Amino acid sequence: MPFSTSDGIRLWTATTGTATGRPAVVILHGGPGLWDDYAVLAAMLDDLVVVHRFDQRGCGRSDPSDVQTLTRSARDIDELRAYFGHERIVVIGHSFGATLAMTYAASYGDHVAGVVYLGGVGVGDWRTAYDEERARRITPEQDARLQELSGRQRTPAEETEFRALSWFTDHADRERAMEWAYASAAVDLPINFAANRALGATGRLTPDEQKAQAAAIRAPVTFVHGAGDPRPAWAVRDLADHVPNHTFHLIPGAGHSPWLEQPERVREVLRAAVMEPK
């Protein structure tokens, strides 16, 4: 069902679940510049709460938008909340969506019942450790092919290959990593690289600013991180330590999308997170 923001951008949305009196859930996708692909997470919660998903402005099935800031994206979430008639919501953000979830919780705290920070990057120099682990997981031949594809126009088949080579290192299970990466890569939606660059440039807080933002959040925050995610868990723990009301769950044998490798454990954690807020 389409929804239009106050500045006229139509957002693709999907709603599932059961109205039970608990705060509804809004799932925030990653990227930035990708799209919602989280029906599997919604299905884990559908018997407990209403779950809303959407493609962020300029992304996936939503309208194009030249306005790409975390402030505007957080406002979009709150406009969606009001449109669907919820006083308070639980926001579940994955990857970049985790950063957006924290921004929303810090900016619209009166409307936040809880936050799930799923597979985020945390605080500090996470990039060095990430690059080192990614280099360990990719062969020289694969890396050379990725670099060759990244520097030119790509056919549809090459675009799928480019995405798979970019994403397969995110998974802890090395035997199934490429299979999962190709499944995500084959989605017939364009990556919004302009949004990726813009949000990367405008959304960067200093470590001290991130910690101050985290300290200002009063809602319970559930941090969930795959032990096999190349993004280091210590950076997420460091951020979590600055949130007054938080829990931290490190999922063994799981990578950046831990529900693929450890679905039952992720289901257990997510259900606990949405059942806690009153």
Language-model region placement:
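Conserved alpha/beta-hydrolase "acid-adjacent" motif
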Residues: 230-235
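Short beta-strand/loop motif that positions the catalytic acidic residue
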Residues: 217, 223-225
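Conserved alpha/beta-hydrolase catalytic His-Asp/Glu region
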Residues: 150-199
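Catalytic active-site module of serine/aspartate enzymes centered on a nucleophile-bearing elbow/loop
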Residues: 246-278
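Conserved HGGG/HGGXW glycine-rich cap/lid loop of the alpha/beta-hydrolase fold
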Residues: 7-63
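Active-site loop/oxyanion-hole signature of alpha/beta-hydrolase fold enzymes
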Residues: 52-96, 268
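Flexible "cap/lid" loop of the alpha/beta hydrolase fold
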Residues: 115-152
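Conserved hydrolase catalytic core segment
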Residues: 87-130
